[in-house]
Swiss-Prot record:
Main location: cytoplasm
Subcellular location, record wording: Cytoplasm
Family according to the record: Belongs to the TraY family.
Record's subunit section: Part of the relaxosome, a complex composed of plasmid encoded TraI, TraM, TraY and host-encoded IHF bound to the F plasmid origin of transfer (oriT). Interacts with TraM, probably through its C-terminus.
Keywords: Activator, Conjugation, Cytoplasm, DNA-binding, Plasmid, Transcription, Transcription regulation
Function of the molecule: Conjugative DNA transfer (CDT) is the unidirectional transfer of ssDNA plasmid from a donor to a recipient cell. It is the central mechanism by which antibiotic resistance and virulence factors are propagated in bacterial populations. Part of the relaxosome, which facilitates a site- and strand-specific cut in the origin of transfer by TraI, at the nic site. Relaxosome formation requires binding of IHF and TraY to the oriT region, which then facilitates binding of TraI. Also positively regulates tra gene expression.
Cystine residue pairs: none
Molecular function (Gene Ontology), one example: DNA binding
Species this chain originates from: Escherichia coli
Claim: Transcription regulation is one of the keywords in the record: yes
Cellular component aspect of the GO annotation: cytoplasm
Full protein name: Relaxosome protein TraY
Presence of keyword Transcription regulation: yes
Amino acid sequence: MKEPKSNIRKLIDIGGLIGR
């Protein structure tokens, strides 16, 4: 939780896989 940016990047990674 010390790196919120990592959370956003993970969401984008998952979203990209689902959006594919």
